[in-house]
Amino acid sequence: MSGIGEERPRELRWYHAGPMLFGDLGTSRLYVLGLAFYFTRHASFFHIIAVNILLVLVSCCYLIICRKYPEGGGVYSSARHSSKVLAVIGGLMLSADYTVTAALSCLDAFRYLGVEAEVSGFRLELACTLGAIGAIGLVNWFGPRGMGRVAMVVAIATIFLTFVVAICAIPHLQHMRVEFPVKERYNLSAWGDAWVGFTEVVLALSGIEAIANMTGIMVPPVRVTSRRSILPVLMEVVIMNLVLAAAMNALPDAKLINPEGHPQGTDNMMAVLATAYVGPTFSLVASFVFGALLLSGVNTAVTDLMAVQYMMARDGEAPRILTRLNRHGVPGYALIISLLIPSLLLVIFPDITELAGLYSVGVVAAITINLLATGYTRQFQLGGWERWMLVLVGGLMGAILITLLWTKPTARAFSLAILNMGLAARMVTLAGRANVPAATGRMFQGIGGLVFLAQGAITFFLPAQAWEFLFFSVANTIFLALLSGYLSRKIPEKVVRRHLENFDGDYDPITYHLVAANRPSTFIHGVLEDAQKSKAGVIIVFVRNLAHSLSGSAAHHAMADDQEAREVFETALDFANNLGVPLDLVYLPGGPI
């Protein structure tokens, strides 16, 4: 693999990112509808309304996050300004979610496609699932736009077919049967059961965190690209989920519950609705498209699992080799790992029910950390209502997280295992970089390796419900966080050359202020403050006078190599980022006239 650099190119447009987001959010209805009925029966309509309200609130928060973090708005980027350990924890939690999402979506895709045979004792659907993950990785090797185009075609086909099902179902909605989630309004336990039922179906949120991780490769202005990516998808998902939830509850119980009293269609409810309201032939075609949509969701998960590794490695929290790009601007080694981890999970847990038990905790934890870290940060200005919304929605997500940790021991165990094994691997990396005696570094690396193996052992040999597992896992987390904190303080601060590019800001400027500067100055801050008040942009011009004519090699005199220019531009970018003012950088090298 020939690395050509470490800065990924910005080539993802809204019509690439939007379908990729739909590949995650849109897939939610393929299993959320069935799971909602499985857990809450005819009270599922109210639960889906509540999930949609939560989805709108979280999406509004992520519009703010994408605007404020154009270099990457995922949990790792936002939490890093508060705490390196917290950022790594958020990144690992998100990685756990992406791993399960990729494995679960890919396996469910072949359920929709009807692949369930066995060949020589080996399940054909599992073989197809592993092959599909490899094929998705091969396409991603050539950059995100390829799968973005495929995702766009699949998204358009899915929206059309879903619209047909919804239109055909509308005349039957008068038969909808709805039950209030709380059967005894004055019974506190009944309200608790309703809350737990709601948390069981909060599965549609990982796509929002995924789109935030893509801001680092979106074409500028990122705030516009992210908004155009999120809002149309959000509108379609919310409206169609409500209509389809009503259509599901309008079906007779004979089509929803089998003679033994167990819910049907838990993993393919959209196929059930297509058969009931349109017909079996249409359902067959729709199932093929729905399977393709699930594979699109796999692509989104793999892309963002790769992005998290890239950002952590770029900051020295993971091996530097993960930042090495191939000739197409893709971190190749990170891509390979992003394919191997969900494939290994599928080999260990080859059943949809088992995989579903690992879901939710990771993404809810990541979103909680992201919202609260952004809401409490002081590195940039936020409107009063923006800060309050981030904090309040983050608090709500925190309550959901606590509930999931209590009620889903398998998901809790899986998330703790990923967290501790990731922290142990991080400690090994930090020990190799820390300014400590060689023997001390080897000792820390040995401790990290032992903790890694110990966490793997207790995960496999202790039941997830056992208090011993919880005790040892939490103790490992605290132990690793403390040791890693010590090692981080022993690592010399490395001067990282900031990538200089124009800053989009929070608004479209109606005019521009032009400033010529040859050194950092508080005057620049004053101009930016005035520009913020009048919704203007600022252009900073640095003129480099050269004592020779600009020809030959001098014609390539670069802004990045001019230390004085870098100081001016970096100072201006810091001020602009804090105030949210659009800033353009102009570097003019010139010789004598």
Residue ranges and their predicted role:
Residues V85-A87, F122-L130, V219-M240, Y310-V347, ...:
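Loop-to-transmembrane helix boundary motifs in multi-pass membrane proteins
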Residues G74, S229-G297, I321-V347:
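TM-loop-TM module centered on a large, flexible mid-protein loop between adjacent transmembrane helices
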Residues V150, I321-G332, I367-A413, M427-F452:
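C-terminal membrane-solvent junction of multi-pass transporters and transport-like membrane proteins
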Residues A464, F503-E564, V568, F575-V586:
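Small/aliphatic-rich secondary-structure junction motif
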